Amino acid sequence: MKRGVSVARRSKSWRSGNLATTRYERCYPEARKSSRAEDIFMHIDYWHGDIGVDVKGNNLPDEIWVELKNVRGEPGWVFGEARYIAFDMPECGGFVIVSREELKEYCRLHVDLSELVQKKDAYKRCYSRKDRDDLITKLVLEDLRTLPSYVVKPYCNSYSHPDGGDKMYVS
């Protein structure tokens, strides 16, 4: 029997994802939000013209989870149609953006697919959550830095004040 995701975990995941999308929209106000179908089937959250980007929240520099298979056992987001993956990374002051194709190739070359391991041992090895058909691996920020496309897009440092709409600056 498959277990569902707890309400608390789903809520935390939604909040962190929602925060990442809010930050992304502030960095790229011209980006067009994808449709629900594009998000689910193409793994694209935003469009910049004909270039798709998949935004990932809830990451740490020493814990970046890459989905090889989703919870249904289907190809994960690293095999999606987005051109870029944007990892929300507050420790870097913005989004770490890499080519999805480069990340996929990095995983092909460096991730050991031969056996499943426990979560604590999942660095460049495969892990599957209990009662799920997913396959994920853990990378770290230094791994992403080796990709030629690696770039950090700083967070937007301004916002509109709710009283009057004056432009305010964070720093």
Descriptions of predicted regions:
Residues 1-171:
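Nucleic-acid endonuclease domains
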